[in-house]
UniProtKB/Swiss-Prot annotation:
GO terms for biological process: amino acid biosynthetic process; aromatic amino acid family biosynthetic process; chorismate biosynthetic process. The active site is at residue 304. It is an enzyme of class 2 (transferase). This is 3-phosphoshikimate 1-carboxyvinyltransferase. Catalyzes the transfer of the enolpyruvyl moiety of phosphoenolpyruvate (PEP) to the 5-hydroxyl of shikimate-3-phosphate (S3P) to produce enolpyruvyl shikimate-3-phosphate and inorganic phosphate. It catalyses: 3-phosphoshikimate + phosphoenolpyruvate = 5-O-(1-carboxyvinyl)-3-phosphoshikimate + phosphate. Monomer. It holds the Pfam family EPSP_synthase. InterPro entries: Enolpyruvate_Tfrase_dom (IPR001986), Enolpyruvate_Tfrase_sf (IPR036968), EPSP_synthase (IPR006264), EPSP_synthase_CS (IPR023193), RNA3'P_cycl/enolpyr_Trfase_a/b (IPR013792). It comes from Methanothrix thermoacetophila (strain DSM 6194 / JCM 14653 / NBRC 101360 / PT). 3-phosphoshikimate binds at residues 20-21, 25, 162-164, 190, 304, 331. It is found in: Cytoplasm. GO terms for molecular function: 3-phosphoshikimate 1-carboxyvinyltransferase activity. Keywords: Amino-acid biosynthesis, Aromatic amino acid biosynthesis, Cytoplasm, Transferase.
Length: 421
């Protein structure tokens, strides 16, 4: 699908979609318990992959109205009968690889993007904790073969690639037969996502002790998550909020305080010069545009914001430096390189750094852009098109991964966005 974007003025109110990250975790942890209900889940391509994988491991997940009713496996997932295809969901691949180590074995694969993403730290850890885990191609990429069973022990993880490896082990290891200790080497990138995992696990009754970058948990535990309501997604909300800062004003509802690191978008927009108010009790964030100013941004804990921040920096007065984001090169695509290439087509003065981007703000012009089959690239480039006008972006269907209603919400806010096949 190709989306055409014209210069637009933004105004109005939309509701933040449910959090993709919380939905993944709540669905899986409930599926590993006896039974429960996840209210207001995000139903998207990625979360459907997790739901399908949970079914493959023996759970029964049914959508009833605005809730998922889940009959779980009581801590004993079944050995899947077929290969698990995670489609484009890296979260599903990493989480389900750890769950597979609680069974007799499973094979996991995904699309071409998934088959290019590294999993070495997770495979190493699973092997050290008693499972047998390897890449069929011998390159740490999917397809992956995982054979159980986890028995506990000690392992370490390189924290510089993805916190998903840690989250996967935190979910699976309390269900193993022995005590597990996990140590993080180096800086843990995207730490808020690991904290999100711990938050839901503890709500489900898991006992996990943390001491800085060391995580300890006994084996033989069980989960109970009878009900869980998914909060609004700050990662997705960053797009309408940034659109308002760039081209008007808008209110996004459903944004309450949580463990989401991407709530940093509120402070970033304010520091760049936008008028921002957040009523934490009502969950409403209102942004009014202004002349934005460039600034230095540490993206180590907010990797999903990087494409949006690149667009803001391309328009803001002065220089914007996005740093400590080298792990963003290992997402659906190399998002640092992709944003540099595409914004240059629009006239941006942008340079790649090993760990991020350096951007001198200015005027953008319309262009034909490549979306890289990456939902966050497509949504960020749509924001650039709202400012520049006369812009076309391909592979726009990829927004279904995390924000199926993105283009509808943008039109609701006044964006002139038209889709064609």
């Amino acid at each position: 699908m190709i989306v055409s974007v014209s210069r637009s003025s933004i105004s109005g109110t939309v509701c933040a979609p449910p959090s993709k990250s919380y939905t993944h975790r709540a669905v899986l942890i409930t599926a590993l318990s006896d039974s429960g209900c996840v209210h207001r889940p995000l139903i998207s391509a990625d979360t459907r992959a997790t739901i399908s994988a949970c079914d493959a491991f023996g759970a029964d997940v049914k959508l009833r109205g605005d809730s998922l009713e889940i009959q779980g496996v009581s801590g004993a997932p079944r050995t899947p009968e077929n290969v698990i295809d995670v489609l484009n969901s890296g979260t599903t691949l990493r989480f389900m690889s750890a769950v597979a180590a609680l069974t007799d074995g499973a094979v996991l694969t995904g699309d071409s993007s998934i088959r290019s993403r590294p999993n070495g730290p997770l495979l190493k850890a699973l092997n050290e904790l008693g499972a047998e885990a390897f890449s069929i191609r011998g390159n740490d990429r999917a397809p992956l073969v995982i054979r159980g069973r986890l028995r506990g022990g000690s392992t370490s993880l390189d924290g510089s690639v993805s916190s998903q490896f840690l989250s996967a082990l935190l979910i699976a290891c309390p269900l193993s037969s022995g005590e597990t200790t996990i140590s993080i080497k180096g800086e843990l990138k995207s730490r808020p996502y690991a904290e999100m995992t711990l938050d839901i696990l503890r709500k489900a009754g898991a006992e996990i002790c943390t001491d800085g970058d060391i995580f300890r948990m006994r084996g033989g535990q069980s989960y109970r998550l009878a009900e869980y309501t998914v909060p609004g997604d700050f990662s997705s909300a960053s797009y309408p909020l940034a659109a308002a800062a760039l081209a008007g004003s808008a209110t996004v509802e459903g944004l309450f305080p949580s463990r989401q690191g991407d709530s940093a978008i509120v402070d970033i927009l304010r520091e760049m010069g936008a008028e921002v108010s957040w009523d934490m009790e009502s969950g409403e964030v209102r942004v009014s545009g202004a002349d934005l100013r460039g600034r230095e941004i540490d993206a180590s804990q907010t990797p999903d914001l990087v494409p949006t921040l690149a667009v803001l920096g391309a328009v803001a007065e002065g220089r914007t430096v996005i740093k400590n984001a080298e792990h963003v090169r290992h997402k659906e695509t190399d998002r640092i390189h992709a944003m540099a290439v595409e914004l240059k087509k629009m006239g941006a003065n942008i340079r790649e750094r090993p760990d991020g981007l350096e951007i001198d703000g200015g005027d953008l012009h319309g262009a034909d852009l490549h979306g890289y089959h990456d939902h966050r690239i497509v949504m960020a480039l749509t924001l650039a098109g709202i400012v520049a006008g006369d812009t076309r972006i391909d592979t726009a269907e990829s927004v279904d991964v995390s924000y199926p209603g993105f283009f509808e919400d943008m039109r609701r806010l006044g964006a002139n966005v038209r889709a064609s096949t």
